[in-house]
Swiss-Prot record:
It comes from the Bacteria. Belongs to the NAD-dependent DNA ligase family. LigA subfamily. It comes from Myxococcus xanthus (strain DK1622). PANTHER family: CHROMOSOME TRANSMISSION FIDELITY FACTOR 18, DNA LIGASE. This is DNA ligase. NAD(+) binds at D35, A36, Q37, Y38, D39, S84, L85, E115, R138, E178, K294, K318. One of its GO terms (molecular function) is DNA ligase (NAD+) activity. The active site is at K117 (n6-amp-lysine intermediate). NCBIfam families: dnlj, PRK07956.1. Gene3D superfamilies: 5' to 3' exonuclease, C-terminal subdomain, 6.20.10.30, BRCT domain, DNA ligase/mRNA capping enzyme, Helix hairpin bin, Nucleic acid-binding proteins. One of its GO terms (biological process) is DNA replication.
Length: 672
């Protein structure tokens, strides 16, 4: 065996190993190796492909980052039509569905399979000789859009099939499924967008659909998409299944992720499954809007066939919506720190899902036009789980006779500067360089917990400082005197002293916090950390080329251009120099080489008395550790403060080492 043959054999072995570890981590949430071990395997494969370029195949795990942007999506004709399910909304509909099935099949009772109905985007995937070669959206059911490059970026989707139990992989296999975003990932995505000054997504489905249909796969790669598969198209080499459950287990054996399911005997069994699903819907890690009910027996399915574009053998039993109707009292425009003009509906307060809702974002002009929300309208408002409230629909029959469409402003409502659309045409921004509304939001961000952490500098104080003209730039904050502060509303001696002390403390900061505090568009906390590691001093960014910035971890071409433009702008350079001259001293990141936290995954839970959660996170990261948001078998330590909840319980179940606050502080001191 020559060198190339050895390299090819090792590459195939690495494909299999990495696919196995991806499945354990992204599907089962039960990893067998550490991040460092996984990265070592990936680097070995990358090195092999660099030495032997012909080994870099489209299904290689190294190709998940996404290729070049496309001008438009190609069309894909589906091998078999992608049909959609009919909906039912009450028990009567379920009873009628079961009666029809029993009558057509001629049996007194039917076995069903019940699955959570994901609120995602339907897809078709094609594998040839076990390698993923094409993926498409449903489209009109006959023809969909080719989104292969974007689907390659989804970590839970295997690029190659490595079956268990010596199952033979068909030469051609087409499977159907759904792309979605998990709740925790959606929450993190919106938090990141908020950090970066970008408009929030309304719900996980919108985020998933928008992410999958990005023309630039690198944008999709930055979004935390997941996938479940639930169907495969009959073909040569594909087993003939007796039941749907048998089919699901076959997909699972091939290494494809499947949703949870439950077998139900007859109508009463489905009712019990529905009641259990409805009761436990908020416990699931993803949003569901109902339960899919399918006949389990494959022969019965063939006999039942389909009507129009829906199968007779399946139905979507929708959950009652968590929606309430209320009145739109007004529509206003909110100006963000990056100048984005966001329409906001001010509502007559109403309780939705146990929470009082008085405002709902309308996201942007296109969304406002699509829904045609107007002042005085009666609307339905939905709030699902942790998702921000959104207006679902307008009750047109109750629309006032004198209502008029909302006129989106051509100028900023605060500074009257011209408002222009972004390159993608979705967001309208104020162009005013000295817009007071932007300045207020920028100061709020500058003082926020992850930035300079200036305690006592909140929304109202920021607005007062700007409106009185005392603060026109960040550096002006450090020139404030106690006498200046005492002239402001609701500011006494003690409050003024505390704020001055907080401002003084904030001067001793980190480069990561400092870069994040500047409010650069697209730059959240994680990107600020990566930039700080690459450029320990801000002045280095003044001299950095676009290529230098593009080499920073997780910085894509669009973000790199924005960052480069920001630091080339003389006004921004002047603002940074003014802050440094005012005494702000951003410390360069320290790289830990030893100690109990190096390379460890730590989860923080509960309230701590000796420091804030953010301070604890910084201390762990400064010592070479990584703070994760959830507990898994990969977690090395869980630091449990007061009133620790589900994370502590999971750590106990998994046998993860648990530290109380005192033990954690002692570990920090021994590794100071």
């Amino acid at each position: 065996m020559d060198d190339f043959q050895k390299a090819a054999a090792r590459a195939r072995e690495l494909h299999r190993e990495l696919a196995h570890h991806n499945y354990r981590y992204y599907v089962l949430d039960s990893p067998e190796v550490s991040d460092a071990q996984y990265d070592k395997l990936m680097r070995e494969l990358q090195d092999l492909e660099a030495k032997h370029p012909s080994l870099q195949t489209p299904d290689s795990p190294t190709q998940r980052v996404g290729g070049a942007a496309a001008e438009e999506f190609g069309e894909v004709v589906h091998r078999a039509p992608m049909i959609s399910l009919a909906n039912i909304f009450e028990d009567q509909g379920l009873t009628e569905f079961d009666e029809r099935i029993r009558k057509l099949v001629g049996l007194p009772g039917i076995a069903y399979v019940c699955e959570p109905k994901l609120d995602g985007l339907a897809i078709a995937l094609r594998y040839e000789k076990g390698a993923f070669v094409q993926g498409a959206t449903r489209g009109d059911g006959t023809t969909g859009e080719d989104v292969t490059s974007n689907l390659r970026t989804i970590r839970s989707l295997p690029m190659s099939l490595f079956p268990q139990d010596d199952v033979k992989v068909p030469d051609v296999l087409e499977v159907r499924g759904e792309v979605f975003i998990r709740k925790k990932d959606f929450q993190k995505l919106n938090e990141k967008r908020e950090e970066e000054g970008e408009p929030l997504f309304a719900n996980p489905r919108n985020a998933a659909a928008g992410s999958l249909r990005q023309l630039d796969p690198r944008m999709t790669a930055a979004r935390p998409l997941s996938v479940f598969l639930y169907e495969c198209v009959p073909g040569e080499g594909v087993p003939v299944f007796k039941t749907h459950i048998e089919k699901l287990e076959y997909l699972k054996t091939l290494g494809l992720p499947i949703n949870q399911y439950r077998r139900a005997e007859g109508l009463e069994g489905v009712r019990q499954a529905y009641d259990a699903s409805l009761k436990g819907r908020h416990e699931l890690p993803f949003e569901v809007d109902g339960m899919v009910v399918k006949v389990d027996d494959e022969d019965q399915r063939k006999r039942l066939g389909q009507v129009s574009k829906s199968p007779r053998w399946a139905v979507a039993y929708k959950f009652p919506p968590e929606e309430e109707s209320t009145e739109v009292m007004d529509i206003g425009i909110q100006v963000g720190r990056t100048g984005a003009l966001t329409p906001v509906a001010h509502l007559k307060p109403v309780k939705v899902g146990g929470v009082t809702v008085a405002r709902a974002t309308l996201h942007n002009e296109d969304e406002l036009r699509r829904k045609d929300v107007r002042k005085g309208d009666t609307v339905f408002v939905r709030r699902a789980g942790d998702v921000i409230p959104e207006i679902v629909s307008v009750v047109l029959s109750k629309r006032p006779a004198d209502s008029a469409p909302f006129e989106f402003p051509k100028h900023c409502p605060v500074c009257d500067a011209v408002a222009t659309k972004d390159e993608d045409g979705a967001i309208i921004r104020c162009t005013g360089a000295s817009c007071p509304a932007q300045l207020v939001e920028k100061i709020r961000h500058f003082a926020s917990r992850l930035a300079m952490d200036i305690e006592g500098l909140g929304d109202k104080l920021a607005a007062q400082l700007v409106s009185t003209g005392r603060v026109k730039a960040f550096a002006d904050l450090y020139a404030l005197t106690k006498e200046d502060l005492l002239t402001l509303e609701r500011m006494g001696d003690k409050s003024a002293d505390n704020l001055i002390a907080s401002l003084e403390r904030s001067k001793q900061t980190t480069q990561r916090r400092f870069l994040y505090s500047l409010g650069i568009r697209h730059v959240g906390d994680a990107t600020a950390k990566a930039l700080a590691e690459a450029f320990p001093r801000s002045e280095m960014l003044f001299e950095a080329s676009l290529e230098d910035i593009s080499r920073v971890k997780d910085v894509g071409p669009i973000m790199a251009q924005v960052i480069h433009t920001f630091f080339q702008e003389p006004q921004n350079q002047e603002a940074i120099r003014a802050l440094l001259a005012a005494g702000v001293q951003p410390a360069a990141p320290q790289v830990a080489t030893g100690g109990p936290f190096v390379g460890k995954s730590v989860v923080l839970t509960g309230a701590m008395t000796g420091m804030t959660r953010e301070q604890a996170k910084e201390e762990v990261e400064r010592r070479g550790g990584k703070v994760a948001g959830s507990v898994s078998r990969k977690t090395d330590f869980v630091v449990a403060g007061e009133d620790a909840g589900s994370k502590l319980k999971k750590a106990q179940e998994l046998g993860v080492r648990i530290l109380d606050e005192q033990a954690f502080l002692q570990m920090l001191q021994t590794n100071a």
